[in-house]
């Protein structure tokens, strides 16, 4: 089961990532990939694009949850037909 602390961490992770400035040097070693410190070719995302990405992510997540719900729910067993004649069951035929 997922703990509330993990959900809170996942919700606050984008906020922490947004607080960092592009090109900021990290405390990782220089040989670590992606720590050059430059942000050439990086651009800020426009607000409508960012809102669209968040909305698309939410819709995709809801579709996945719906598909899992439909596939994982218990199936109904077919109704028994009492009109059948059973040889070894007295009183039913």
UniProtKB/Swiss-Prot annotation:
Tissue and organ expression note: Predominantly expressed in hemopoietic cells such as NK cells, subset of T-cells and monocytes. Detected in leukocytes, spleen, and thymus.
Documented effect of changing residue 88 to Q: Abrogates cell killing and interaction with GRB2. No effect on interaction with PIK3R1
Give the UniProt keywords, A-Z: Disulfide bond, Glycoprotein, Membrane, Phosphoprotein, Signal, Transmembrane, Transmembrane helix
| Short name of one Pfam family | DAP10
**Region PIK3R1 binding site: start-end pairs:** 86-89
Q: Which GO terms describe its cellular component?
A: cell surface; plasma membrane
Effect of altering residue 89 to Q? Abrogates cell killing and interaction with PIK3R1. No effect on interaction with GRB2
Function of the protein: Transmembrane adapter protein which associates with KLRK1 to form an activation receptor KLRK1-HCST in lymphoid and myeloid cells; this receptor plays a major role in triggering cytotoxicity against target cells expressing cell surface ligands such as MHC class I chain-related MICA and MICB, and UL16-binding proteins (ULBPs); these ligands are up-regulated by stress conditions and pathological state such as viral infection and tumor transformation. Functions as a docking site for PI3-kinase PIK3R1 and GRB2.
Into which family does the record put it? Belongs to the DAP10 family.
Q: What is this protein called?
A: Hematopoietic cell signal transducer
Name the species this protein comes from: Homo sapiens (Human)
């Amino acid at each position: 089961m997922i703990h509330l602390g993990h959900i809170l961490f996942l919700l606050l992770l984008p906020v922490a990532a947004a607080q960092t400035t592009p090109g900021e040097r990290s405390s990782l070693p220089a040989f670590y990939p992606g720590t050059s410190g430059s942000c050439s070719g990086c651009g800020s995302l426009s607000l409508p694009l960012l809102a669209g990405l968040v909305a698309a992510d939410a819709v995709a997540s809801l579709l996945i949850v719906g598909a899992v719900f439909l596939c994982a729910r218990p199936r109904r067993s077919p109704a028994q037909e009492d009109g059948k004649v059973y040889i070894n069951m007295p009183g039913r035929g």
